[in-house]
Swiss-Prot record:
EC identifiers of the protein: 2.7.8.32
Membrane topology: Single-pass type I membrane protein
Native species: Cryptococcus neoformans var. grubii (Filobasidiella neoformans var. grubii)
Chief location category: Golgi
UniProt record, GO biological process: carbohydrate phosphorylation; D-xylose metabolic process
Gene Ontology MF term list: glycosyltransferase activity; UDP-N-acetylglucosamine-lysosomal-enzyme N-acetylglucosaminephosphotransferase activity
Compositional bias annotation for Low complexity: 16-29, 42-52
Protein name: 3-O-alpha-D-mannopyranosyl-alpha-D-mannopyranose xylosylphosphotransferase
Record keyword Membrane present: yes
Top enzyme category: transferase
Alphabetic keyword roster: Carbohydrate metabolism, Glycoprotein, Glycosyltransferase, Golgi apparatus, Manganese, Membrane, Transferase, Transmembrane, Transmembrane helix, Xylose metabolism
Length: 864
């Protein structure tokens, strides 16, 4: 029967069973609706009739058709039987890619990588848990059996970025010297870590070791430097009282000894023996301690006593070879060190359990106390000077051989040089001696902030400056002069040779990032100086005063970064060039100094320091208030790096006005670029101005700061939206897994450094990346910001009882004193002086820290 065309709304005539096929032809207005219905592969005449009798059904949307097709064709295959192989193959590929060798992706080139994805975080990762239960208190308060943390995973140190301001805030701050950013954009205020070195010279075990090594090294090191006067506990209390709620972690660096078996077995907590048996058996390839010859029949017996007979031979060997003994302050309760532990008195769980409704902010943000032994911080770099490629060779063997020469160490300078290797260290640190005390409330900004950088307290006497020469008669100096001279000699090989100011005897501000830079830049000298067990030894060129080196390194890296920003990143990129000073540069310099057509014969230019408002009264307070951060409370600021570089110190009687002007000799400073109008490499000009003729670089900085106006440093930077393409990967080079932050070469001398844009970006940008060079320079400068400041501080030598009384009366009578340094080199009345000191300490800081053994949960709590 021939088909009949359907034209609604008229009812179609009755049809035989086989006539319905014509109604589903493509020409039928019902075709799409019928064909799209689920499960209608053979519609019966009755269903077709009902469909045709019903109202008109609009065509289905494409998305519904897709869902229908997916449901019809894919759902039957989504079963455990089909999904399990897919999951197992995916897991296998992931394991191969992450643990054996990286697998290339066919889509890798379609996704453009971003540099931000390759930077490490500013936060140093927390250290691993030590073997055993490190939350337990020590069995004996004098010593602690512990399993050292492993060496940092290579390559180490990996340079991490400083905390940068957000891009829009960074631009405003560096270009204009102020910012519209508020608390939301700026983020939370920085918190600080604090570090102390401590040793108990009265400990017979430590004293016997020192005497033995003193005889081996044939030196005479006085024991009075190591006497314990109970200063540490009160130094820590003073910091807690001065900065409540603003401290992240306290770090104690402690001496340690090899594990003597079986004598030290009694220092191992019996409760951890079962776990140690399991761990020791696994390290020896055994599956269970019961398989060990001589192991106890029941693990339950292991917790009853710890004797040589109650542990397996494998565990005994494990303890002797891998465990060590830590010297500890007797007042320290190791079970109350970590506020994140629910059993800690200040943990929210413990607070709510005690029925307290409200917690004091100082307790809610109480710092963690971490300890590290000399063994755990004495390491050598396993990375090249760029901070990116791992050094090849027998690294572990080299480090172990070096440790044999360096440890045990009785030299505080050698130990201080390892502070940056502390596990879990923050970027901003206050480094204290145990005889440093904070007497007044302080803000974080009294020490460090992302806006102004680290606060340095220099001494400003001309004759107190440190000479740049290594003197043979100071190589074995028991004081610090030899270490200072050596440190300045290292700086003078890398930067201009000059006198550099000494710093006040107060807590020092260190940034972990700068410590790691110094560890790479001067790694040979620091590795050798760290093997000097005593200051009196005649090894190498002497000790290195690391804290002073880091302080002065910050000043020099800032100056270097300023000049690189102008000479290479700004002048070197004019007119589309990436590496040359040319006619465009000459025109820019003439415009900077206001040359006219008649000034071609000008050879010398007198530069005057312009007016600056960076440190005008009230400005800093407004900036911190706008950011939602606390303004400084106990510091007077003398100079900000946002105003260029510190003026040189003058001799007594010299006119201070001479630091407000300078002369630029164009022929001398710019050489053939100016005299013969030859094009030169921008990196060569950078070396000329920065190192060969440092007075030229200093005067150019003054000129550019003046040209920037009253605030900001805009004259240094390249124009906005200046982009430079980073070099592509060279033959055989591997794609970087992580990127170091913007930084300049870490070579030990300036002669061998390559300051070209291509070289700098080859290690601090992704291959082929389009780098916003203006933002890059601002991030570079952020690493080295600093303030020169002074606080009302006292430093006293406790010689006798009468002298001690006078000192304490004077301090108590002057509430302006904010920092106290107290040297206990007692010459007479030793017991009386010690009693006076402890009496004054307890009067000044009666509230005990929560980790002290006799901490009282009522008397020692914080109150509003």
């Amino acid at each position: 029967m021939p088909s009949t065309a359907l034209s609604p709304p008229s009812r179609p005539p009755a049809q035989s069973y086989d006539s319905y096929s014509s109604s589903l032809s493509p020409s039928s207005p019902r075709f799409h609706a019928a064909a799209g219905s689920h499960g209608r592969r053979s519609p019966s005449p009755s269903r077709l009739e009902s469909l045709l009798d019903g109202p008109h059904v609009p065509p289905r949307s494409p998305s519904r058709k897709i869902r229908s097709a997916l449901s019809r064709h894919i759902r039957p295959h989504i079963t455990p039987r089909t999904l399990t192989p897919v999951f197992l193959w995916t897991l296998a590929l992931w394991l191969i890619h992450h643990f054996l060798f990286p697998l290339s992706s066919p889509f890798a080139k379609l996704a453009k990588p971003k540099a931000e994805e390759h930077f490490l975080s500013t936060t140093f990762p927390p250290p691993a848990q030590r073997l055993g239960d490190d939350r337990l208190d020590s069995v004996d308060p004098r010593w602690r059996a512990y399993h050292p943390l492993p060496a940092p995973e290579p390559p180490f140190p990996r340079l991490r970025p400083t905390r940068f301001l957000p891009p829009q805030c960074l631009e405003q701050w560096f270009a204009e010297g102020e910012t519209l950013c508020g608390a939301k954009e700026m983020g939370e205020e920085e918190t600080l870590d604090a570090t102390w070195l401590w040793v108990n010279g009265s400990d017979h075990r430590w004293r016997d070791s020192m005497v033995e090594w003193r005889e081996k090294e044939n030196v005479n090191s006085p024991e009075r430097h190591y006497r314990e006067q109970n200063e540490l506990v009160h130094s820590m209390r003073s910091v807690l009282d001065a900065l409540p709620g603003h401290l992240r972690t306290f770090h104690l660096i402690l001496a340690d000894y090899p594990f003597n078996y079986p004598e030290d077995l009694e220092l191992v907590p019996s409760s951890i023996i079962p776990d140690l048996e399991v761990a020791a058996s696994k390290s020896k390839g055994r599956r269970h301690p019961r398989e060990l010859p001589g192991a106890p029949a029941s693990l339950a017996n292991l917790t009853e006593r710890v004797t040589p007979e109650s542990i397996s031979p494998t565990l005994a060997s494990h303890l002797q070879s891998e465990w060590r003994i830590l010297q500890t302050p007797t007042w320290l309760d190791f079970s109350r060190r970590d506020p994140s532990d629910p059993s800690h008195p200040f943990h929210p769980y413990s607070v709510s359990k005690a029925g307290e409704i409200r917690q004091h902010y100082a307790e809610a943000s109480y710092p963690t106390l971490r300890y590290a032994s000399h063994w755990e911080v004495f390491h050598i770099p396993s990375v090249d000077r760029d901070g990116r490629q791992e050094l090849m060779g027998e690294r572990e063997w080299r480090e172990n051989e070096w440790k044999k020469k360096a440890l045990p160490s009785f030299n505080s300078m050698a130990i201080e040089s390892r502070i940056g290797w502390l596990p879990g260290l923050a970027d901003a640190i206050i480094a204290l001696n145990d005889d440093f005390f904070l007497l007044r409330p302080h803000a974080v900004s009294d020490f460090h902030s992302p806006l102004y950088g680290s606060v340095i307290r220099f001494e400003h006497g001309y004759n107190q400056q440190v000479k740049p020469d290594v003197e043979k008669n100071h190589i074995n100096d028991p004081g610090e002069m030899g270490g200072l001279y050596h440190a300045n000699a290292l700086l003078s090989r890398r930067f201009p040779r000059r006198l550099r100011p000494y710093f006040a005897h107060v807590p020092k501000v260190i940034t972990r990032g700068l410590h790691h830079e110094a560890s790479l830049m001067f790694q040979e000298a620091l590795t050798e100086s760290s093997t000097r067990r005593f200051r009196e030894m005649k090894i190498g060129e002497g000790d290195v005063q690391m804290q002073w080196l880091l302080t002065s390194l910050r000043v020099e890296r800032w100056r270097e970064a300023l000049l690189w920003t102008w000479t290479v990143a700004n002048m070197g990129t004019l007119g589309g060039s990436q590496d040359h000073w040319d006619n465009d540069t000459r025109r820019a310099i003439k415009n900077l100094f206001g040359f006219t057509e008649n000034d071609d014969d000008v050879v010398k230019i007198e530069v005057h320091r312009g007016e600056r408002w960076t440190l005008e009264p009230g400005r800093m307070q407004r900036v911190f208030r706008q950011a939602g951060w606390e303004a400084p409370k106990a510091t007077e600021f003398l100079f900000s790096s946002m105003d260029g570089i510190m003026p040189p110190l003058l001799r007594s009687g010299e006119d201070p006005a001479q630091n407000d002007r300078c002369i630029i000799d164009l022929n001398r400073c710019f050489g053939l670029f100016w005299t013969r109008e030859e094009d030169v490499l921008s990196s060569d000009m950078m070396k000329r101005l920065t190192f060969q003729y440092p007075e030229c670089g200093d005067c150019m900085i003054m000129a550019l700061v003046t040209a920037s106006g009253t605030l900001g440093l805009n004259a240094f930077f390249p124009p906005k939206e200046t982009t430079i393409t980073a070099p592509e990967l060279g033959p055989g080079d591997a794609y970087p897994k992580f990127l170091p932050p913007p930084h300049l070469p870490l070579t030990p001398t300036w002669h061998e450094a390559d300051f070209s844009l291509a070289n700098i970006l080859s290690t601090t940008a992704l291959p082929g990346e389009q780098v916003d060079i203006r933002q890059y320079c601002m991030r570079l400068l952020s690493r080295y910001l600093y303030l020169d400041a002074k606080s009302v501080s006292h430093f006293h030598m406790m010689k006798s009882a009468e002298h001690a009384r006078r000192v304490f009366r004077m301090i108590q009578g002057d509430p302006k004193v904010s920092i106290l340094g107290m040297n206990d080199d007692i010459e007479s009345d030793y017991d009386e002086v010690r009693g006076l000191m402890n009496e004054w300490f307890e009067m000044r800081w009666p509230r005990k820290a929560v980790w002290e053994r006799d901490w009282d949960p009522v008397k020692d709590r914080y109150n509003d």
